[in-house]
Amino acid sequence: MLKLTIAQLNVTVGDIEGNVEKMVSAARQAWDHGSDLVVFSELSLSGYYPGDLLEEPSFMRRVEQGLDALLQASRQLRNLHWVVGAPVVRGGPGKRLHNMLLVIKAGEIVLRYAKQLLPTYNVFDERRHFEPGPDVAKVLRIGEAQVGFLICEDGWNDEGADYAVNPFERMRDAAPDLVVSINASPSNIGKREQRHQIFGAASRRHGLPLLYVNQIGGHDQLVYDGASFAVEPNAGVVFEAQRFVEDVTTLRFDGSRFAALSSDELPKVSVHGLSTLAFYQAQIVLGLKDYARRCGFRRAVVGSSGGIDSALTLALAVQALGENYVAAVTMPSHYSSAGSVDDSITLCRNLGIELTPHPIADLVSGYARQFELSFGEPLRGLALENLQARVRGTVLMEYSNSFGNLLLTTGNKSEISVGYCTLYGDTNGGLGLIGDLYKTEVFALSRYVNVSSGRELIPTAIIDKPPSAELAPDQKDTDSLPPYPVLDEVLKLQIEGERLAPQEREHARSFVGQLQATAEGGALIARVRQMIARNEYKRRQAPPIIRVRARAFGTGRQMPIAAKYL
């Protein structure tokens, strides 16, 4: 009988001392439970993913010091095995580091395993820094059980063709009683179910029980949901840790089955987990909470236009930071409707936050007047429209600089895709909460926020009004863009394509196929593709956005700017 402790922690990239403190605390909890093994996530010591910090000698020295601290702490908990993820310097040709799993006990490293499969796709770029480990299975006897070890991607390629080797097959040949997989698996819609499917199938195929340990927390644009789990070959996923929160849980393992620490029964694992909208909400809230905390911000500010994007951003910010730590600024111009100002007032009253009016009409007029005096030509058309957005962006940055608030941008994925935003205007800020949500999803999540809160936080008037930038008289988004239900289906297929969930992919293909069958629809699709390509330069200069879908702008989609490919 083994006792296994899952240490699903919210570690911070680069905070070696803080991570060590968390890990030691979790190990002591495991010790109190009488555990034989405490399992941390991939690169738990350094935090995942350190990027080019791995090339800094001072950073690696701190990692080594952190490992020494863990070894020292393990001497006090002598019978406990610690499974730790860390970058480790290696010798020989190739990259200078391994992504390593270390098992330590009583002040000694008793097993070393280097990750074999290094992902270099989507948001991952591990080959930039790490050398693959040798094609061998590592197994360690702990008590009466043989325990094998894998690191994240090593388990994702079973029956796949992305790599020439299959660590799961090597593990099967080694015939351990249990496989422990440490992971740093960022979440997106459908990712939890994908993990269950892939690792459940591998466990069943090879007849190997498996413990999968993940981290939680927001790290720049990526959010990790935890949801660590245990799999039995015949029963599938039999245990799941909490999502979006730290969780230190001890299980028993009798050689073939998992059980709770204090009883033989385990809580039933839901097949489907959170709904799509509940997932979006939880992912964004944790992403903002951790981004603000790690960057030293206690407060946020949002420009409140009276539109749905800023309304949803404010509602999510309040959930993440609290009503006393979110401020809103309304900046009406000549073209702002009275309804938009009133809607902002109602929204902020519902959310319990401060709303400060800061009219910009005189600022815009003064700037336009000076422009004409200096250059001999008046500002017209798009230049005058963009001036309003840039004045608002400047006001908000002045607020951020003066009061120390994190400025949140309010652009959605539909607008960002086609460049329907003003560079150095509404793109100003430090983080975008809804930049990976299509406009139709913004509407849906706004309604969900009201339903889940049990009251109308976002006024129905905001949700129901036609979207408008209000930079010109009687302006509507549909003056420049296709209707969002049409645009979003085209964008999904163009930007995410094969990474869409099967049902969503088939719907988008069918919709776009019917659209393309007409001359008008074909022209619309071509125009949208051109808009996406032409506006890469805007996306490159935009702040990071919280990723919720399989392919988000940022590190997960790297496209050239100065190129011709359409």
Please report, for each region that a protein language model flagged, where it lies by residue.
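Enzyme catalytic cores with a strong preference for nitrogen-chemistry domains
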Residues: 1-303, 314-323, 330, 355
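ATP/NTP-dependent adenylation/nucleotidyl-transfer catalytic domains that generate, transfer
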Residues: 3, 207-208, 233, 263-305, ...
